[in-house]
Every structure is written in C-alpha cells, then in structure tokens.
C-alpha cells in the first residue's frame, strides 16, 4: 500500500508514519454518512462508550469468524471462505465507529463477486450498492437521499444472509453446492 506513494515521490518516513500522524484527527461523530450500526442511533448520550462498544463488537465479530473457521477447519470450502470474507468486509465497518462511506467499498466489490459466483444471491450487491449510494449521495450532494438507517438495515440483512450462508457451508450436513 505504501509503494505507490513512495514511487510517486513521497518520503519513506512520511509514508510510514502517515497514519500515526492522523490518529488524533478523527472527529467525535460516531457516523460520517455511512450505513453503519450507528446510523440507527441519532442521540447517543455517551459517544465515547458507544465508540468503545462498537470497536469491541467489531473485534468480537472478527475473532468469532476466525475462531469459527479454526473450529470447522476440516469443513472449509471456497464457498465458506467467500461467505466468511463477506461477513468481515460488511461486518467490520458496519460495527466500527467513525466510519465513512468509502469503508464499504470492499463490501460492494465482494458482494458483486459473490453474486456472480452464486446467482441466487443476486440481491446482495443490490443491497450493498443501495447502502453505498445513500452514503455517497449524502457526501456528494450535501443532503440525504433517504435516511441512512435504511442503508444500515440493508447491510444488516446482507450480514445475516452471509452468516447463514457461511454456517450452511461450514456444517457439512447442510452444505449446498453452487457450481
């Protein structure tokens, strides 16, 4: 990730320390036009606590997915990996505080790849793109197309579908073949 910046002429030390320099520059808002779980919470009395809970939830999700795959490692298939990846790229920015619309780009791309590989799930990229559209529209037009919690609800549904799909793949009794 740093190589293009260095090749373009940015000093190596500046490139390495860029994110450390920006650590204190994050605003205090829990949500910056993103379809995250914080789109449901408009008036939070203790934003610092909510941010810590969101961060803990994201780490818990990540740890749970990794532990689940470790526990079911003999049942891992390419389909299970695809489902697990979708859980992570949707779930982590969905749960983390201070997210912007751009943090869901990987979810947009991976949900599209998922739908191409498993056409029965054609609705997943539509829901992800709908959620992203709400965030990008708010940023670019400086007004909301719809309330951001509609996008958050769409991503919550994508997350649930990805969890159910992955569970079906990791538990061979219920595994479905798609190819």
Model-found features: residue ranges?
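Membrane-interface catalytic loops of GT-C/OST-like multi-pass glycosylation enzymes that act
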Residues: 96-107, 140-148
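Alpha-helical transmembrane segments of multi-pass membrane proteins
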Residues: 109-113, 157
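Aromatic/glycine/proline-enriched transmembrane-helix motif characteristic
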Residues: 2, 6, 10-11, 17-95
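Transmembrane helical bundles and short interhelical boundary loops of multi-pass, membrane-embedded
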Residues: 15-37, 68, 85, 118-179
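Hydrophobic core segments of alpha-helical transmembrane domains in multi-pass membrane proteins
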Residues: 105-109, 127-128
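Short, contiguous acidic/charged loop-to-helix segments that flank catalytic cores in large enzymes
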Residues: 79, 93-101, 116-118
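Membrane-spanning helices that line or support transport/gating and their immediate boundary helices
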Residues: 11, 15, 102-105
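Hydrophobic transmembrane alpha-helices
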Residues: 1, 112-120
């Amino acid at each position: 990730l740093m190589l293009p910046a260095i090749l373009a002429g940015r000093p190596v030390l500046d490139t390495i320390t860029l994110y450390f320099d920006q650590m204190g520059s994050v605003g205090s808002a829990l949500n910056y036009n993103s379809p995250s779980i914080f789109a449901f919470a408009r008036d939070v009395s203790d934003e610092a606590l909510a941010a810590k809970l969101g961060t803990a939830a994201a780490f818990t999700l990540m740890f749970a997915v990794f532990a689940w795959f470790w526990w079911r490692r003999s049942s891992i298939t390419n389909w299970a990996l695809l489902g697990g990846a979708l859980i992570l790229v949707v779930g982590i920015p969905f749960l983390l505080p201070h997210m912007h619309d751009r943090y869901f780009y990987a979810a947009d791309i991976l949900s599209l790849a998922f739908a191409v590989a498993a056409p029965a799930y054609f609705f997943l990229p539509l829901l992800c793109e709908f959620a992203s559209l709400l965030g990008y529209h708010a940023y670019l037009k400086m007004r909301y197309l719809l309330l951001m919690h509609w996008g958050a609800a769409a991503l919550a549904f994508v997350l649930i579908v990805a969890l159910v799909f992955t569970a079906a793949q990791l538990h061979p009794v219920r595994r479905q073949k798609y190819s």
